[in-house]
Amino acid sequence: MVVQHNQPGSTDQSVIRNFCIIAHIDHGKSTVADRILQLSGIVPEREMRDRFLDRMDIEQERGITIKSQAVRVPWTFDGTEYTLGMIDTPGHVDFTYEVSRALAACEGAVLLVDATQGIEAQTLSNLYMAIDHDLAIIPVLNKIDLPSAEPDKHAEEIAGLIGCEPSDVLRVSGKTGEGVADLLDQIVMDVPAPHGDPDAPARALIFDSVYDSYRGIVTYIRMEDGELHDREKVHMMGIGMTHDPIEIGVISPDMTRTKALGAGEVGYIITGAKDVSQSKVGDTLTSAVRPAAEPLPGYRDPKPMVYAGLFPIDNAQFPELRDALDKLKLNDAALIYTPETSVALGFGFRCGFLGLLHMEIVNERLSREFGLDLIQTAPNVTYDVTAEDGSQHHVTNPSEFPDGKIKKIVEPMVAADIITPKEFIGAVMDLCQDHRGIMGTMEYISTDRVEMHYRIPLAEIVFDFFDQLKSRTKGYASLDYHEDGEQSADLVKVDILIQGEKVDAFSAIVHRDKAYSYGVMMTKKLRSLIPRQQFEIPIQAAIGSRIIARENIRALRKDVLAKCYGGDITRKRKLLEKQKAGKKRMKMLGHVEVPQEAFIAALSTGEDSNDRDTKDKIRAAQKTEG
């Protein structure tokens, strides 16, 4: 293993280079990071594995990066040893907040582009973020070893975008390691050194934190000014708390304890605190002995885009769910949650997420890391509803939707940027129109690829828009979106009634044009999931008091005539009349239990409206409306 001569706390700022790797999902960030770790020699050959910095099981299995990782890497250039602070960032649109925090801890960014795919939507969004942070940008084409790579064509695309020469675009292969040494040399030459004041009082920005069940909260920091020493009391300027740190150190590539951290360095500090509220991302850390006067500018708090209810299948697990969310919140600053109660599902939490993948990952982490079995309600967005009497309602859950006449409903909008090959322009336009999109501008970024700009309601994107976009463009299109104001819309609340009683978990707020198809889909789904009873059960979809769709679960027939052998018809009729009266009474008093499996299956986002019968019903209704 390589010996590092630049020791944390005594490294001159002029030899420090902090950079992050940004790219669209699947363009090879983590693979290039692996090669950098290997080349620098800080990871012994026998310990090396693919996606070394993706520490979570989910990251390894799905092949995606969810958490940014900050590593200290030594690199010798022209006889001088430099210290590189490398941050590997996520690529998916849901984790843009992780990327923006990583950018604030760097002076440079390596913009990685797949030489087989070219520029994609997330490449552009990450590039614009890096430009906003005034970072030095190093453009790099990855995967040049693949036979389908077109480096010359894509180098021109990048040059046109950034305003450099095509020859300035570096070419590397994360798989074979070709060109990675040149990339590290370029980082040393192009990325500016940090410019903090080493003699000023210590100031460090908290850019991430994780929870360790043995040592409590591990806080990742970027030192801006001054230095922090081991065992020196630290003060959190935002929340006003003082701690005695247990340990201070750097990640290289595992946690390594050090005596100090100096200006410009990226490292970690363990305060020993177990309370998750005691380490806020974006807060400023300073020395309690010689505190700084002004905190550093923090981050914009992330704003949740999608809300869903999370309920434990076993209600006794509610306290465990609260603890699990508290711990997860520490790793995931973008997650927000408040307790809520549902008549059908009991106690749970209303959670806010950045997007559908974020929601899926949180769900999976809760079940894996904390062993919880959960039911999740259908995702929805926030609406501002004005009732007829002028009262305002902020609705994050269909059950909060006011009854009675509605004057106005305002829904959030997003600006969507879609990059697609030109032969799929028609398919993308159809899809966006079906989802109430408004066409903006369209420009060619190369001879055969187009960037299209649409304004689409967020509610239309959160369900299955991305999957449909991929299937209609054979997987070639990419999507990036950001919030873009709001607009009033003709929305209604569709309630599902089982035996005349509303089941709050199945209610949804949808556009009036799609209310019927949602009603048909949900009633059909429930008909196949709820077990039959001795009496007939109606399942209805309603807007207010108007029923728009209905399915019946047929009654089980008990043969009361089985014990009659031949004989008098009046005897049989008497038995049948008695059964009829019993069923009538049962129907009036009977309570239909919806089994847990039915909730889980009905609320799963996999749409069941693909069968021919449902489609025919919807089509017929649309014709009569037209």
From Swiss-Prot:
- Composition bias of kind Basic and acidic residues appears in 609-626
Q: Name one GO cellular component term.
A: plasma membrane
Q: Which GO terms describe its biological process?
A: positive regulation of translation
Q: Where does the tr-type G domain lie? A: 14-195
The record lists GTP as bound by 26-31, 142-145
Chief location: membrane
- Disordered: region residues: 603-626
What membrane topology does the annotation report for this chain?
Peripheral membrane protein
Q: Which UniProt keywords apply?
A: Cell membrane, GTP-binding, Hydrolase, Membrane, Nucleotide-binding, Protein biosynthesis
Q: Name one Pfam family in it.
A: LepA_C
The reaction(s) annotated as catalysed by this protein in its Swiss-Prot or TrEMBL entry are: GTP + H2O = GDP + phosphate + H(+)
Q: What protein family does this chain belong to?
A: Belongs to the TRAFAC class translation factor GTPase superfamily. Classic translation factor GTPase family. LepA subfamily.
Q: What protein is this chain from?
A: Elongation factor 4
UniProt organism field: Bifidobacterium longum (strain NCC 2705)
Lineage of the species this protein comes from: Bacteria, Bacillati, Actinomycetota, Actinomycetes, Bifidobacteriales
